[in-house]
UniProtKB/Swiss-Prot annotation:
Tissue-by-tissue expression: Testis-specific.
InterPro entries (UniProt xref): FKBP6/shu, PPIase_dom_sf, PPIase_FKBP_dom, TPR-like_helical_dom_sf, TPR_rpt
Organism of provenance: Mus musculus
Function noted in UniProt: Co-chaperone required during spermatogenesis to repress transposable elements and prevent their mobilization, which is essential for the germline integrity. Acts via the piRNA metabolic process, which mediates the repression of transposable elements during meiosis by forming complexes composed of piRNAs and Piwi proteins and govern the methylation and subsequent repression of transposons. Acts as a co-chaperone via its interaction with HSP90 and is required for the piRNA amplification process, the secondary piRNA biogenesis.
Keyword check for Nucleotide-binding: no
Gene3D superfamilies for this protein: 3.10.50.40, Tetratricopeptide repeat domain
Pfam families cross-referenced by the UniProt entry: FKBP_C
Effect of K254A: Abolishes interaction with HSP90
Gene name of the encoded protein: Fkbp6
Protein name: Inactive peptidyl-prolyl cis-trans isomerase FKBP6
Amino acid sequence: MGGSTRDPGALEGAGILGQSPYERLSQRMLDISGDRGVLKDIIREGTGDTVTPDASVLVKYSGYLEHMDKPFDSNCFRKTPRLMKLGEDITLWGMELGLLSMRKGELARFLFKPAYAYGTLGCPPLIPPNATVLFEIELIDFLDSAESDKFCALSAEQQEQFPLQKVLKVAATEREFGNYLFRQNRFCDAKVRYKRALLLLHRRLATCEEQHLVEPAVLLVLLNLSFVYLKLDRPAMALRYGEQALLIDKRNAKALFRCGQACLLLTEYERARDFLVRAQKEQPCNHDINNELKKLSSHYRDYVDREREMCHRMFAPCGSRSSVGGN
């Protein structure tokens, strides 16, 4: 959240005598549970639609006990928070209800009564019995996975009955999941999502009129697969998907670059140079492409030097070789 917005001093400021800080705070909060068990105060408005049931959410949060300045629970120290699925990964009922009221980019403060948090027993020794807790939650993003999960569970014949726009939407969701997992360095999991997206797009037989909608979606997934296989140190597979991307767009700089990277790892230096020079022609000022060409040049020089040394040893005069059985 880029630093807590909670101000303990403000919560404990002047108010009705005998009321606790959380009681005073609750008076200006919105009841979203219907029984004042979950109260909400929006700190920063979000945009777009509210979170859908069964969505997977990317959030930053911090939980506080009353009269405590430091959070008892927080994920704000993580560079990339974990993607959490509603109904599975979130244990607090109050947090789940709160998230369903939020929009992308929103930052809000919630009060959860015991029935929506840790119950009458609490969670010793951290959470005392009957504790009302305050959570600050920032909704970074969310992905509606319910539609994708249901669609992927259908047979190929059932999927064929849906219009193309539905298939494109589900494939895009799978790709977005893959991108998120990729950013978390979970490359194997990302690969699975990308392959699901590609299978959906290939399974749907597009008409000639629809092809212009399908090909761009397929191209993006192929580029993702090529990149993720490079990260998995499987250059042959990276080259395979990169070349498939070039069948769709033979001048695509990313595809040419990925193929060049793969060939370099496979020590196919001539092919690597061909791909990278073509990529450079499309994007002359691309630093990654230019640096890869320098890297190729260095590797090739080392390769030539090793070959020259090996040939020198193979064809050196017999007299210049050390005698194995010498005195």
